[in-house]
Amino acid sequence: MKLISTIAAATTAFGAPNADHTSRQLIFGGGIIPSGTKTYTAGIRTSADGDTYCGGSLISPTHVLTTSICTGYKEPKFVSVGTHYLNGTQDGEQIKVVSAQNHTSLNFSSGTYDFALLTLEKPSKFIPVKLPKADDSDIKPGMWSKAMGWGVTSYPNGSLSYELQGVSLEVWANDECSQVFNIGDTSVCAGGLPGKDACVADTGGPLIKENGLGDLDDILIGLVNWGYGCGDAGSPTVYSRVSTATEWINSVTKGQ
């Protein structure tokens, strides 16, 4: 199984799909998230008003959680927190990134502990998303989750969505997903229904559990990571399992 390069992953968002292990960078088969909701969702950019090239989640007033491809493919210079749009400064907050660090146990070859934290120049006014419990009790096989991003809405030749999109996906048990992909405990799989998926301009974006009636109850359970194809029946997307990184996250966010 070959992990395509980060540059190639971005290229395939507009060209022919890579049939191999593909970094997931789009949302399709879903719908538009209402403006002014899910405002913990962050777009990672190289300029304040430029296009979002990766997704992330505000997990403290001064930290955005994403995946390592988002710190390696391009330099993350700004995040747009609370925005509904792919680019521009018409809403949300555009905040400068002052540092980026990958998980201390990140293994590029196996894909374990694929997490990165961006530290912001100033606190965001938006409310961070809740982190899951470290005991993994917030994830149950068969539960429904939601992935979000600004990626293309059709595959393979779609264009990026100007508005934030979301799609509902069923969570798989790891032993079930292990029959399809070689994954470990730091991953979680979701999806597998035809035409509904995360795929090839929003890696690092959130997979959430909607735990109540409002966004304040949402729990961040995963980060868009990789998979084979897009929206194929029986082929889910692999997400970084956030519960396995809570100790590291807390050590960074509380130490700064």
Curated annotation (Swiss-Prot):
Gene3D superfamilies xrefs: Trypsin-like serine proteases
Glycan-bearing residues: 87, 102, 107, 157
Annotated protein name in UniProt: Glucanase inhibitor protein 2
A GO term, aspect molecular function: serine-type endopeptidase activity
All copies of domain Peptidase S1, residue ranges: 27-254
Keyword terms of this UniProt record: Disulfide bond, Glycoprotein, Secreted, Signal, Virulence
SMART domains, per database record: Tryp_SPc
InterPro entries in the cross-refs: Peptidase_S1 (IPR050430), Peptidase_S1_PA (IPR009003), Peptidase_S1_PA_chymotrypsin (IPR043504), Peptidase_S1A (IPR001314), Trypsin_dom (IPR001254)
Name of the encoding gene: GIP2
Gene Ontology biological-process entries: proteolysis
Quaternary structure annotation from Swiss-Prot or TrEMBL: Forms an apoplastic complex with host endoglucanases in tomato leaves during P.infestans infection.
Annotated GO CC locations: extracellular region
Role description: Secreted effector that suppresses host plant glucan elicitor-mediated defense responses. Targets host endoglucanases and inhibits the endoglucanase-mediated release of elicitor-active glucan oligosaccharides from P.infestans cell walls.
Main localization, broad class: secreted
Organism: Phytophthora infestans (Potato late blight agent)
Pfam families, per the entry: Trypsin (PF00089)
Record family assignment: Belongs to the peptidase S1 family.
Compartmental location: Secreted
SS bonds (residue pairs): 54-70, 177-189, 199-230
PANTHER family noted in UniProt: FI18310P1-RELATED, POLYSERASE-RELATED
Signal sequence, start to end: 1-15
